[in-house]
Amino acid sequence: MRKIMLFMVTLMLILMSSCGKSESQFDKELNKAYAVMEKTRFSSALMCDKISSTWNKAIFDNRTPSGKYCSDFNDALTELFDNFSESGITDSIKNWNNEMQKLTSQMNDAPHSRKDCYNDFVDIVSEVSSFSRMATSPSGNLRSYNEQTTSTFENISKKIDQFKIKYDTFIKK
């Protein structure tokens, strides 16, 4: 009877340890997703900044990104988005955002010791996804757009700083 009980406990331990990802596998996936997240965040920030400055210049100077006269800021933003499309930056941000979300969802079977890390990372990814949409589909007026992008960027930066402090050993430098 003891042998059967010992066998069952051993078998259960083996099965439990084989379920889910290993910590090293999770850390690899985290680092890959983290790198894509940073690319998405950085590119979105550059794009949001360019949108804001173009919008501002169109309203106050009546100029498009190429310096042409415009009486409507929508003309300037259309020209800017045409430039973004030609350069591929809009598609890149959308693709990185999709990749970031896909990689993050693949990490959902995190080891117990990494569950908090995963949950915190999901929170950051959600904010970065929202920020990337602000870059690819601006809305509102110039003031609200600037307030929203600035607030979101600062929020993301704060969360990333906290994430780096809490999970420094999981992220490769």
What name fits each language-model region?
Residues 20-25, 112:
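Acidic/polar low-complexity scaffolding segments in large eukaryotic proteins
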Residues 15-18:
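C-terminal motif of bacterial Sec signal peptides marking the signal peptidase cleavage site
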Residues 2-10:
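Sec-dependent signal peptide recognition
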Residues 67-93:
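Polyanion-binding interface signature
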Residues 26-77, 114-173:
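C-terminal amphipathic alpha-helix
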Residues 86-121:
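Mature extracytoplasmic domains of secretory-pathway proteins
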